[in-house]
Amino acid sequence: MSELYDITIVGGGPVGLFAAFYAHLRQAKVKIIDSLPQLGGQPAILYPEKKILDVPGFTNLSGEELTQRLIEQLETFQTEICLNETVLDIVKSDDGFTITTSQAQHQTKTIIIAMGGGAFKPRALELDAAESYSNLHYHVSNISQYAGKKVVVLGGGDSAVDWALAFEKIAETSLVHRRDNFRALEHSVEELKASSVEIKTPFVPSRLVGENGKITHLEISQVKGEESQLLPLDHLFVNYGFKSSVGNLKDWGLELNRHKILVNSKQETSVPGIYAAGDCCSYEGKIDLIATGLGEAPTAVNNAINHIYPDQKVQPKHSTSL
């Protein structure tokens, strides 16, 4: 039988990393299980260079920097970390729970699920032969390589607006969105309108023109009208969001609401001893932000400790008094 842990955290993104660190402050024996080959979740893999604006105390923090700071914080303690392991099943046991993954079985007294939106892949651009072009991208890495290029960004949410603003500093940039209004933070939209980004609204991509495996032009068509334009480009970035999959979540006996785990004010799920924090959980008034998830993590940890040791107070000493 495998070693018994106090708290096993499913998910190694920002919320999972901070939950693990905080659990160590409560002197818990902690394990992290993640299906990805590295820690950090979406910020580390999908937008390592994108600036994150909703983490308190930082005005210019990238996904990579956030991940590195959280990992460095966690490295002050010994944490068992299991990567490339997909959770297949969770079953109640005498000591707590048995977690079966694609690699092993894990024994734990309590569980904190911090898996974000689950497995994720970008929503594809649905135009003929789109996937055959090498200069069509869904992620940005090493933004400096696009300096001096013609860049077209598709989308109207935070990622599209933020990337358009980032590219504008180094490249000739256009942003194409199907509506006149953007779904991004108001502050970012004001920056966009004051920038040199060429805003194309309300237009949708209608055709790709290319040669030798690369797109040379994007044809866009007016949503309600007959106008069309041909935009020259060197690189096309698609920011239509992500399709997420919660995998076997529905089979773990947890009450769900629209593919998210219902929790109470203790971050406790419908199964005693299992908690959830971050984007994977749901409650009335829930806002999906990294900052929100980081705040939910200590609540989940403290109540998990109280589940293990009912005689201990849920409210611990403040870290400043330790």
Swiss-Prot record:
Its cofactor is FAD. Binds 1 FAD per subunit. InterPro entries: FAD/NAD-bd_sf, FAD/NAD-binding_dom, Fd--NADP_Rdtase_type_2, Ferredoxin-NADP_redctase_2. GO terms for molecular function: ferredoxin-NADP+ reductase activity; flavin adenine dinucleotide binding; NADP binding. It is an enzyme of class 1 (oxidoreductase). Keywords: FAD, Flavoprotein, NADP, Oxidoreductase. Its EC number is 1.18.1.2. The keyword Transmembrane does not apply. This is Ferredoxin--NADP reductase.
